[in-house]
């Protein structure tokens, strides 16, 4: 009987233990188990520690990489080199484009340059070793040019013929070019020798390259006649 009672208690204790395991609760299953609750707590504490260690190692690595990286802008460039580079770049950006040369402008410039060059011409006189230069644009006609030539060479002729008083007095009394003693000729752009006064004044200025004062006695008679006619036309034009 005693054995049956003991056996019956064991069955009751086992049934009570099974019923207590089947009880419902609102907590986590690990809360009711000491062994299971201790393990997750250890894992949970170990996990943050591992995370902190990993974060610490990872945080230390970028600082080392940044220290090992080369510094930008090293070696330093001197200030005057920087200023020189900046000024050259700004001047290249602000430089105006070169002017376009058109053929019409070039032809016009060449013509103007030729006209300006033709304004000053050399003039020589027979018996005078030194030449002069005259500005044809400064005179308004053939009469003014003849008077200017007389003024240029009268003193030189007087100095050369100082020994002959009669010739010097004649040269001082009369007009050399206009009086018939000397004749004014010129060389045109083709190299031909022409008498002054045969063409209009503007054409003469454009084509005359060199002037020469020749003695009328050295010229042939037809030339003298043409010279006299040209002087008359020049006097009429003036």
Swiss-Prot record:
Residues 229-238 have a biased composition (Basic residues). One of its GO terms (biological process) is auxin-activated signaling pathway. This is Auxin-responsive protein IAA2. Residues 118-216 form the PB1 domain. GO terms for cellular component: nucleus. It is found in: Nucleus. Induction: By auxin. Aux/IAA proteins are short-lived transcriptional factors that function as repressors of early auxin response genes at low auxin concentrations. Pfam families: AUX_IAA. Highly expressed in flowers. Gene3D superfamilies: Phosphatidylinositol 3-kinase Catalytic Subunit, Chain A, domain 1. Keywords: Auxin signaling pathway, Nucleus, Repressor, Transcription, Transcription regulation. Residues 33-69, 82-114, 217-238 are annotated as: Disordered. Homodimers and heterodimers. It comes from Oryza sativa subsp. japonica (Rice). Residues 33-44, 59-69, 85-94 have a biased composition (Low complexity). Its main location: nucleus. The keyword Membrane does not apply. Belongs to the Aux/IAA family. A motif (EAR-like (transcriptional repression)) lies at residues 24-28. PANTHER family: AUXIN-RESPONSIVE PROTEIN IAA17, AUXIN-RESPONSIVE PROTEIN IAA2.
């Amino acid at each position: 009987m005693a054995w049956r009672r003991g056996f019956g208690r064991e069955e009751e204790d086992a049934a009570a233990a099974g019923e207590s395991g089947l009880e419902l609760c609102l907590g986590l299953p690990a809360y009711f188990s000491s062994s299971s609750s201790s393990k997750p707590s250890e894992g949970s504490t170990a996990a943050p520690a591992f995370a902190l260690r990993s974060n610490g190692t990872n945080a230390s690595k970028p600082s080392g990489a940044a220290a090992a990286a080369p510094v930008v802008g090293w070696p330093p460039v001197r200030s005057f080199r920087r200023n020189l580079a900046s000024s050259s770049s700004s001047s290249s950006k602000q430089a105006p484009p070169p002017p376009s040369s058109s053929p019409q402008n070039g032809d016009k410039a060449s013509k103007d340059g030729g006209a300006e060059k033709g304004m000053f011409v050399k003039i020589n006189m027979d018996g005078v070793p030194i030449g002069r230069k005259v500005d044809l644009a400064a005179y308004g006609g053939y009469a003014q040019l003849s008077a200017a030539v007389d003024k240029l060479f009268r003193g030189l002729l007087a100095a050369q013929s100082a020994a002959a008083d009669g010739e010097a007095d004649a040269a001082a009394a009369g007009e050399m070019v206009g009086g018939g003693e000397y004749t004014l000729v010129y060389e045109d752009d083709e190299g031909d020798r022409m008498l002054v006064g045969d063409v209009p004044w503007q054409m003469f200025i454009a084509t005359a390259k060199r002037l020469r004062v020749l003695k009328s006695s050295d010229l042939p008679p037809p030339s003298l006649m043409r010279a006299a006619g040209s002087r008359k036309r020049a006097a009429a034009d003036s």
